[in-house]
């Protein structure tokens, strides 16, 4: 299966304009609330209508504004699981799932098909219960089972774990992942959780304010998120204004600190265009992940900087330190994550840190 999307829609001052393709893979759409993720899924499903553009699925045109094509949701055979699961409270779990079987397939084999999907998702024992009698995680699996028995041409999950606690979320991710692998077609997975995306997606696209900032494999996007907002969505806590000194050095504008950096690779495809080499002058910010700031262990380490520790936050297995340059201690610089045992053994007011040039994210404004 293959999905091609190039659509636009305006809502007052907000404009959604996205273009991407997906094959037999899990493509995650990562973005903050209100960026257009859910609306994108709704337009693919036919629940909402784009103002303009084209949507194709496996060579079939689902929507084309110029050709006046707009298939109904039923004609599109798309599986969309909403955040609230939308189960029928007056029906048992079994009946809820049976409702997903298309009318032209409701034959003698429908019962066996429903039972097989229930077994796959480990909900067989819930068959005679009603949605109000089962947990949120169980409701989620029922909703997914109802979609799977409809044999959709594409599966779209809208933040499927957002209402679940961390322990249950991780457990159910594995169950859903097994179902996705059995599905074997295109899956769109909307999320604002970067860890969830990293664990489960093959590729990811970062959506910000209605536009795609970057799209690529999960490792590519985390390694080179391209823009400050995209870097923040991948979990980067230190994003600092910077200006070019030369092709391998940048100055942090707020601190007058010069850092050695790697040449910009320009490795990712940006929405709708082929990536090109980014000139150093286009770089507006740098991103430094907390765990990439380390204590100096060798005086030959690059990008050394003496810092004052202005605060610390204890986590179960680490500390997050607030750092400021010793030369300007009143101006916060960055946050650093350090192993709990190491910091408790070496805690001090000053810390000499190092940052590998290869770990510095080179970012640009849109």
Please report, for each region that a protein language model flagged, where it lies by residue:
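Helix-to-loop junction immediately C-terminal to a conserved catalytic motif
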Residues: 45
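Non-catalytic connector elements of ABC transporters
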Residues: 5-26, 32, 38-39, 49, ...
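ABC ATPase nucleotide-binding domain helices that frame the ATP-binding cleft
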Residues: 38-41, 142
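C-terminal boundary and immediately downstream tail of ABC-type ATPase nucleotide-binding domains
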Residues: 223-249, 287
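ABC ATPase NBD Q-loop/coupling interface
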Residues: 54-76
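A position-specific signal in ABC ATPase nucleotide-binding domains
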Residues: 48-49, 56, 102
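ABC ATPase nucleotide-binding domains
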Residues: 77-79, 87, 92-229
């Amino acid at each position: 299966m293959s999905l091609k999307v190039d659509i636009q829609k305006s809502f007052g001052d907000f404009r959604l304009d996205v273009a991407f393709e997906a094959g037999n893979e899990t493509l995650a759409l990562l973005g903050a609330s209100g960026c257009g993720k859910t609306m994108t899924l709704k337009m693919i499903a036919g629940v909402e209508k784009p103002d303009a553009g084209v949507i194709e699925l496996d060579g079939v045109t689902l929507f084309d504004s110029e050709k006046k094509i707009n298939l109904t949701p039923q004609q599109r055979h798309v599986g969309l699981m909403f955040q609230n699961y939308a189960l029928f409270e007056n029906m048992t779990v079994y009946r809820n799932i049976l409702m997903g079987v298309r009318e032209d397939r409701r034959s003698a084999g429908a019962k066996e098909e429903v039972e097989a999907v229930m077994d796959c998702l480990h909900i067989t024992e819930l068959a005679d219960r009603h949605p109000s009698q089962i947990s949120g995680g169980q409701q989620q699996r029922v909703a997914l089972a109802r979609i799977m028995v409809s044999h959709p041409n594409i599966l779209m999950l809208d933040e499927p774990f957002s209402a679940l606690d961390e322990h249950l979320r991780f457990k159910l991710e594995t169950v859903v992942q097994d179902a996705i692998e059995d599905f074997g077609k295109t899956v769109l997975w909307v999320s604002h959780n970067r860890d969830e995306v990293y664990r489960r997606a093959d590729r990811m696209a970062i959506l910000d304010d209605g536009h795609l900032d970057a799209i690529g494999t999960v490792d590519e996007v985390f390694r080179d998120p391209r823009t400050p907002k995209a870097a923040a969505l991948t979990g980067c806590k230190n994003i600092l204004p910077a200006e070019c000194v030369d092709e391998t050095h940048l100055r942090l504008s707020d601190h007058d600190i010069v850092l050695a950096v790697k040449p910009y690779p320009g490795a990712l495809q940006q929405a709708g265009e082929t990536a090109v080499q980014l000139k150093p002058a286009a770089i507006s910010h740098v991103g430094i992940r907390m765990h990439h700031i380390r204590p100096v262990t060798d005086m030959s380490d690059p990008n050394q900087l003496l810092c004052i520790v202005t605060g610390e936050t204890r986590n179960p297995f680490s500390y997050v330190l607030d750092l400021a340059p010793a030369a300007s201690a009143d101006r916060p610089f960055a946050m650093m994550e350090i192993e709990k045992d190491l910091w408790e053994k070496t805690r001090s007011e000053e810390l000499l840190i190092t940052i590998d040039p290869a770990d510095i994210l080179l970012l640009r404004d849109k």
